Amino acid sequence: MENASALSPAGDLTHAQFPAGHFVIPDTNVFLHQMDLIESPLFVPPIILLQTVIDEVRHRSLPLHSRLKSLIASEDKRIYVFYNEFHAQTAVVRQPEESPNDRNDRGIRLSAAWYATHYASAWANRSSTSPTIVLLTDDADNRRKAARDGITTLSVREYVSGTKSSAALLDLLAAESVEGDEETGTKQGRRKVLYDEYLPQATLVAGVKSGDLHQGYFNANAYNYLEGSVNVAGFPKPVLLLGREAMNRSVQGDLVVVELFPESEWKAPADAVIDAEAAQRNDNPDDSASEGEHSDDEDAKERKAARDTAARNPKEKQPTGRVVGVMKRNWRAYVCHIDRTSLSSTLSTLSAQTVFATPVDRALPRIRLRTRQAPELLGQKILVSLDRWDAHSRYPDGHFVRALGQAESKEAERESLLLEFDVPYRPFGRAILDCLPPEGDRWVVPPKETGRPEWRDREDLRELIVCSIDPPNCQDIDDALHARQLANGNIEAGVHIADVSHFVHPDTPMDNEAASRGTTVYLVDKRIDMLPSLLGTNLCSLRPYVERLAFSAIWELSPDADIVNVRFTKSVIASKAAFTYEEAQIRKDDPTLNDELTQSIRLLNSLALKLKAKRMAAGALNLASPEVKIHLDSAESSDPIDVEQKELRETNSLVEEFMLLANVSVARQIQESFPGTAVLRRHMPPPHSNFEKLQDLLMKLKGMTLDVSSSGALAASLDKCVDPNEPAFNTLVRIMATRCMLSAEYFCAGSVSRETFGHYGLASPIYTHFTSPIRRYADVLAHRQLAAAIGYTPLHATLHTKSHVEQIMSVINRRHRLAQMAGRASVEFYVGLALKARNLAQQDGQGVVEDAFVIRAFRNGLAVFVSKLGIEGLVTFKNEQEFDPESYSLTLPGPNGAVKVAVFDRVRVKIRVEQDKNTLRGKVKMTLLSPVDSTGF
């Protein structure tokens, strides 16, 4: 940001209409609707940003206000903030019967006029023409009034058309326009209305309050583009939405309002796979036949498909309804490809044309956009922002933001992942780096005898036999452990955690950035750090053979692992070794080793086994997830060379048990000390209805019962789900049970009732995260609260305020969820690359053959899980199969007669990764080989 008094003399000289120079004053709607344009490095005019505009953007959209603040702070933009509300000649008072919006528009016009007069006066004695002050607004009435007052004003499109980068900047314009377009309006008037108009906001709010309408988040069906659902609080099952009309322009994650149909009209979810890409392949983005005048036959077919796939199993009926309004859009920029078939072959290369952009997220609809760069963008991943979705339009409209690179290149795929899951990956700015110790990587723990502040109230634990146990190549070592026998027969065990809060002080630029990022994000080939690497992989990392600051939890435990007492202390440690899980396991099991370090690991392991037994006896769940390990080429290419299931050893459990013990102990301490604002983590019990399908599957296909009355009952039931003929069956059931669970979440202790604190999966009445402050911001907050609880330092004011803690919890819950999704998507991408490489390595190139398990049956296909690769896929059939929803099975024709395939069956599949020639999306295609070869049907 530059100060208004430091305005450069003539502003920008490159615009065709203003050769003598100019400045722009955008109104509020320009920032609300054209932020991608303003942020573009190609948009170069100096901007006079009015206080009125800043305040209005803040009230209308906090995310856009955050982006605006970043622009103001950017050194790449010439933005001059003018506090017009405090200037005697530009401040305005709202007039009687004047709306707040009209008052603000009048204030903006007055400021523009004042600046124009001010500049003309300053230029009076110069021979050259004074620069022009240009008011940018897409409000036709505002432009008319400005012109009446002698103010130079242009619409955004008019202004951009005169810039030297107009071809690229015009593509960035949002499809939505405040004033509308006469031609477009006429065209829209001729179109058939496809969707019901949304109810007014006041009607929606009143309806939800009265209970006549219901509110929840929209979820698209991954298997059927004609079906969606809305999770409504208090409903045992989601509200089902069948067909485009019922979903009514909802986009994944939108907060929508639904109207329930009478119970006689309730339906069951789909029992068939309906692929959007195949159904929409022939749509024309620029043809009204693909829009409001879409063929009545096509509409009828879609409605029939939605009905036919729904009501086959009356026992599974659930609340059914339609969307009548949207409370909050979840729209953002989406990673897409240009659909090759939507390009016009008759237009010139530089002509603007309407094309389809297909999002990589299959839960999203195709997006229409106009661009002059369509031919150049083919084959690339691009970023597209959603702007509007009109009732007469089959698809939403958006605008091009920028190109990300060639599809399937690792660089473009990595950036796509980060953007798709909203992972902040910008380099740490100067203000953040200035928070680091000035010594940089030469910082060391000072000698104790110097009496430096680092040693204040810290225990000297450097002589303890401490070690860390982590995955291979771990650089951000958060935790280390020790155990030793005590003279009284008990055992001392310690968990030592990196003292991140010593370096990250509250309400500093580095702290605010860590709070915004929320967590470190781990991709297969890259780590996006929450904190600068100087801290995460060096000064805070508990490396071996160097002294480090720590926060220690130390227990006295009985030989049976009962807690005698626990204490918490700031400390200095010197780790004696950094093991991988495999190295620690080998050391523990080696009978020839009996040194202090090995004895400590064995002692820790014996305690961990007892701690785990106690947890399981209390009802903790032993669930499973399909985790795989990607082996990358050590060369610069980092190509995947193999995929294997992760192997879990005793030492994995050893570390897990002591981290759980530390987290539970710290949770008790901080909740006792700060009952109103303690940062805790909970896992709510899932509704019993979440398990109904799995219970029915187990009973009908295996004769097994699943008791979900409590976590302990569920754990005992899962232990009994054993098939002697299929060793992997129990793991498969545990994976399926995991998917019935709710997600764990961070929360503020004073915001919920005490009865809801518990962690269902761990069977613990209270829990928090303390053990990974290098990579989780929640742990940093827990450290600060624990330090205050033991009297080490006063608690910062921000952690005394419940509303502030609630706000942080909301951010880090979202960041944590998105980070997990980004990590899984990265694994899926590299598994796909590995499969493609294996396909190419085979002589026939026909695909990789693996065992899989059927996890779901449809009328026209099977969903299968390939445990070795940790991936799911669809095997689809076009004809001749017979579907039985009661037995969750398909009967397929075989060479020796019909063969029945049901959920839980082991099958053999051929796997290929194909690239859709239109969308450029990689798609896993599976074909059944055994018990029936489905290649021919």
Segments predicted by a language model, with ranges:
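Short linear interaction motifs
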Residues: A4-A10, T28-F31, K237-V239, P365, ...
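Structured beta-strand/turn binding interfaces of compact recognition modules in eukaryotic regulators
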Residues: D27-Q34, L50-T52, L136-D138, V156, ...
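Short interface patches used for recognition in eukaryotic signaling and trafficking proteins
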Residues: T90-P100, S127-T129, F235-L242, R366-I367, ...
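Charge-lined substrate channels and their catalytic hotspots, especially those that engage the 3′ end
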Residues: V178-G494, S501-V546, L890-A902, R921-F937
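Eukaryotic short linear interaction motifs
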Residues: L32-Q34, E39-S40, I54-H59, H65, ...
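Electropositive polyanion-binding surfaces
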Residues: R362-P365, L383, R388-A391, Q406, ...
